[in-house]
């Protein structure tokens, strides 16, 4: 169990096999409300809506099931409005709560619905993908996309509980699982050189989804995220390090209309390019930049991208809409060495063009 230390808003991250069966009991113990809704998507719902629903019923709740389309395109204000309508139709009140059952899209969407419906009701995260378990379910960032860019509408709104059931990873498609490894690798780059070295050594165990290896890695990633969020909840400084690779990654997602790349795949490309920028601007040793590229490739993730001139123009336009832009300047998180990064680094467009054209030898 990992605790996110936020004073009277602190909460637990429970990580184990079979914790989904405890959902109802844990919600009842926390007295989250009298009524509840499960928000899930068409893919996850097939596997896990019934056990979640049954657990809540056993604890005395009468849950409402809200099913949204699967995929990044569902992370929109249109879907938010549809969720509001269903909650209102079933007369959920202030003393109600939402269960976000799914991956990062569902967690961000359902969390934003919880943050804004009736000016805020409680919610619980039940992440069912590796990416969501190690990253997006923890820390309270919730929101949706606009056509112009990713996560441009959102809030900081903490869950009351995070339940990471490792059994849910068994049904995860291989591509989705590998995409989640991008965020796992990120934690080694930004915070923990020993974790990075372990990933270089033990990546085959993770790719085989060995339970002990997964449990340890998910817990360590959650510990790092909890430590960072506990010090800087609303990204005034330190929390920005969690965005390593995300400036370019989010822009890639936006210009491909959230269809070509999974989130983790785009972030993997962004991390490789951020490592190249780091080698040029913040003294990251070239051998470390190569290690970053190699471990991403070993995880089966893309570490390069080819863009036409028109696509580059659109990429820069999307990056200028990034939340980290200040005074019209694109700001990056860059690495000094594996395990240590700096944030708020100004990077001129010409430098980004150079790394887009470069290769690591």
List the model feature ranges, each with a label.
Residues 16, 38, 76, 127, ...:
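Residue-level signal for inorganic ion chemistry
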Residues 182-184, 283-361:
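C-terminal charged capping/lid subdomain of soluble metabolic enzymes
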Residues 84-101, 110-125:
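Non-catalytic interfacial helical region
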Residues 105-112, 133-134, 250-251:
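Short glycine/serine/threonine-rich phosphate/pyrophosphate-binding segments
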Residues 112-205:
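A glycine/threonine-rich phosphate-anchoring loop and its flanking beta-alpha core
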Residues 1-97:
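ATP/NTP phosphate-donor binding region
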Residues 5, 31, 91-93, 116-118, ...:
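Solvent-exposed alpha-helices and their adjacent loops that cap or buttress functional pockets
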Residues 197-313:
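Active-site segments that bind and position negatively charged phosphate/pyrophosphate groups
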């Amino acid at each position: 169990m990992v605790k996110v230390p936020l004073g009277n808003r602190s909460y637990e991250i429970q990580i184990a096999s079979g914790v989904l069966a405890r959902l109802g009991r844990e919600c009842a113990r926390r007295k989250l409300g009298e009524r509840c809704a499960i928000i899930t998507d068409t893919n996850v719902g097939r596997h896990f809506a019934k056990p979640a629903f049954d657990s809540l019923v056993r604890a005395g709740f009468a849950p409402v099931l809200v099913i949204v389309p699967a995929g990044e395109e569902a992370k929109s204000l249109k879907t938010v409005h549809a969720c509001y309508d269903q909650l209102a139709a079933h007369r959920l009140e202030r003393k109600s709560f939402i269960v976000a059952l799914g991956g990062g899209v569902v967690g961000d969407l359902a969390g934003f619905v919880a943050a804004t419906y009736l000016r805020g009701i409680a919610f619980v995260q039940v992440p069912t993908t590796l990416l969501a378990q190690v990253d997006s379910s923890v820390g309270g960032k919730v929101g949706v996309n606009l056509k112009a860019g990713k996560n441009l509408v959102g809030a900081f709104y903490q869950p009351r509980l995070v339940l990471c059931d490792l059994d849910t990873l068994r049904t995860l498609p291989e591509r989705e699982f590998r995409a989640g490894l991008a965020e796992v690798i990120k934690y080694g780059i930004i915070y923990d050189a020993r974790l990075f070295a372990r990933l270089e050594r033990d990546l085959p165990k993770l790719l085989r989804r060995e339970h002990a290896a997964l449990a340890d890695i998910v817990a360590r990633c959650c510990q790092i995220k909890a430590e960072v969020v506990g010090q800087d909840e609303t990204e005034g400084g330190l929390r920005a390090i969690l965005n390593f690779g995300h400036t370019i990654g989010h822009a890639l997602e936006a210009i491909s209309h959230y269809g070509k790349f999974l989130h983790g795949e785009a972030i993997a490309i962004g991390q490789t390019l951020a490592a190249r920028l780091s080698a040029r601007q913040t003294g990251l040793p070239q051998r470390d930049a190569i290690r970053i590229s190699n471990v991403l490739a070993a995880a089966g993730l893309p570490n390069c991208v080819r863009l036409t001139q028109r696509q580059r123009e659109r990429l820069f336009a999307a990056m200028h809409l990034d939340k980290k832009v200040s005074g019209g300047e694109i700001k990056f998180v860059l690495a000094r060495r594996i395990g240590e990064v700096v944030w708020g680094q100004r990077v001129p467009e010409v430098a980004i063009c150079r790394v887009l054209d470069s290769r690591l030898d």
